[in-house]
């Protein structure tokens, strides 16, 4: 049986050393972001059916350094609960949406997950904290190359990036325990359905 979930609303040790003051500031801002995500989950529970997100999902969200996934000029706003521009006419998703879609995916430590639409790489990094392997596809080459560099810098060795049209999936790595699509297609691409394991789960806006 295939479960396709439609959200009701609408990533080696790191080589980037930060001063202790900046680390403290980011930790405080990240904690505030997590509190806002939890509050928004309660506020939207009637629409999503999820008054709270799983502990593992929240722990992953609280660990990933979102400020590394946005341009320098946006770092000050990295832990605000809103999307931000990342260049190439693309955005990094609102943290609440990342948490919601990740929770809907119900990731397990042994899972192999396909992400369609790498973008900044932030969603893939969150998944990498939760599952065994993440395959992610990005059609915008500069974004894909930037994400590859970030994954290397941050030590996400369980993330593999491909440049191309994600709606065709990644047949060589299939089948997948779950698939997450970060942008809404006109219809659910059949190749993605075909590449899900029996009983697999797809989260798609």
Task: Label every PLM stretch briefly.
Residues 3-14:
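Bacterial N-terminal signal peptides
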Residues 18-114, 130, 145, 149-153, ...:
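Class I SAM-dependent transferase core
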Residues 104-205:
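Conserved nucleotide-cofactor-binding alpha/beta core module
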């Amino acid at each position: 049986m295939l479960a396709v979930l439609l959200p009701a609303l609408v990533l080696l040790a790191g080589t980037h050393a930060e001063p202790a003051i900046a680390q403290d500031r980011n930790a405080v801002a990240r904690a505030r972001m997590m509190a806002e995500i939890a509050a928004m989950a309660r506020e939207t529970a009637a629409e999503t059916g999820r008054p709270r997100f799983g502990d593992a999902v929240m722990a992953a969200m609280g660990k990933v350094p979102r400020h590394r996934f946005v341009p320098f000029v946006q770092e000050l706003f990295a832990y605000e609960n809103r999307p931000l521009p990342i260049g190439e006419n693309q955005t990094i998703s609102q943290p609440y949406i990342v948490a919601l879609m990740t929770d809907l995916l119900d990731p397990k430590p042994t899972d192999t997950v396909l992400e369609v639409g790498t973008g900044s790489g932030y969603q893939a990094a969150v998944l990498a904290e939760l599952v065994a392997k993440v395959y992610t596809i990005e059609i915008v080459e500069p974004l894909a190359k930037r994400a590859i560099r970030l994954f290397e810098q941050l030590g996400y060795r369980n993330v593999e990036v491909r440049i191309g049209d994600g709606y065709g999936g990644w047949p060589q790595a299939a089948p997948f325990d779950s698939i997450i699509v970060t942008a809404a297609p006109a219809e659910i691409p059949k190749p993605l359905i075909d590449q899900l394991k029996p009983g697999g789960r797809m989260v798609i806006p």
